[in-house]
Curated annotation (Swiss-Prot):
A GO CC annotation given for this chain: plasma membrane
Name of this chain's protein: Tyrosine-protein kinase CpsD
PANTHER family: FERRIC ENTEROBACTIN TRANSPORT PROTEIN FEPE, TYROSINE-PROTEIN KINASE
Organism: Streptococcus agalactiae serotype Ia (strain ATCC 27591 / A909 / CDC SS700)
UniProt lineage: Bacteria, Bacillati, Bacillota, Bacilli, Lactobacillales
Family stated for the protein in its record: Belongs to the CpsD/CapB family.
Length: 232
């Protein structure tokens, strides 16, 4: 099995917010034992959903739960800079396109009880890949192996992928950056996700500052992943 190492800087960053994510983990546990497959999304890019996904998965693993973190943001992966491999790895897109077995894409990490499915190479048809039978087949195969499965999805305000993924999940969490996104866009994102049939578990207000007084704005639906990837 391929092994990934979480980079030291990311591990130190997660340590600083450990208590915060331990509290979120506890709230998830109290929400019900049936809530074990969770989609994490945001309205747009740069709000911290990938960091939230990683930190939550770390918290669950460190609490003794066998946890799988899936990088399903195949258009614009942030986790590729969080976990490093010594050699060539296969990821989610390889499996969804029929070019890898499930066992080929689940990677061990240097964190006990935490495994990761990398995103893989950027595909020409991300949404179509998620809609084929392989994604649900994967979830069915792994749901009884892990205590928790955390799926980092693309922003629901930019592409529909997150709702497709959430359809196979028990619940979803919406991450939003304080002072950046207008409330009505957050509410619209929540409604879009709920249409998938997945349960709304809550909103994480990220990057909070005492100076924040209003919500911002956003746009560019459909252009996600086509801009300079260095922005994220």
């Amino acid at each position: 099995m391929t092994r990934l190492e979480i980079v030291d800087s990311k591990l130190r960053q997660a340590k600083k917010t450990e208590e915060y994510f331990n509290a979120i983990r506890t709230n998830i546990q109290f929400s019900g034992k049936e809530n074990k497959i969770l989609a994490i999304t945001s309205v747009r890019e740069g709000e911290g959903k990938s960091t939230t996904s990683t930190s939550l998965a770390l918290s669950l693993a460190q609490a003794g739960f066998k946890t799988l973190l899936i990088d399903a943001d195949t258009r614009n992966s942030v986790m590729s800079g969080t976990f490093k491999a010594t050699g060539t790895i296969k990821g989610l897109t390889n499996y969804l396109s029929g070019n890898a077995d499930l066992g080929d894409i689940i990677c061990e990490t240097n964190v006990p009880r935490l495994m990761v499915v990398p995103s893989g190479k950027v595909p020409p048809n991300p949404t179509a890949l998620l809609q084929n039978a392989y994604f649900n087949k994967m979830i069915e195969a792994i749901k009884n192996i892990f205590d928790y499965i955390i799926i980092d999805t693309p922003p629901i305000g930019l592409v529909v992928d997150a709702a497709i993924i959430a359809n196979a999940c028990d619940g979803f969490i919406l991450v939003t950056q304080a002072g950046r996104i207008k409330r009505n866009y957050v509410e619209k994102a929540k409604e879009q996700m709920e249409q998938s049939g997945s349960k709304f578990l809550g909103i994480i207000l990220n990057k909070v500052s005492e100076s924040v007084a209003t919500y911002g704005d956003y746009g560019d639906y459909g252009n996600y992943g086509k801009r300079d990837r260095k922005r994220k």
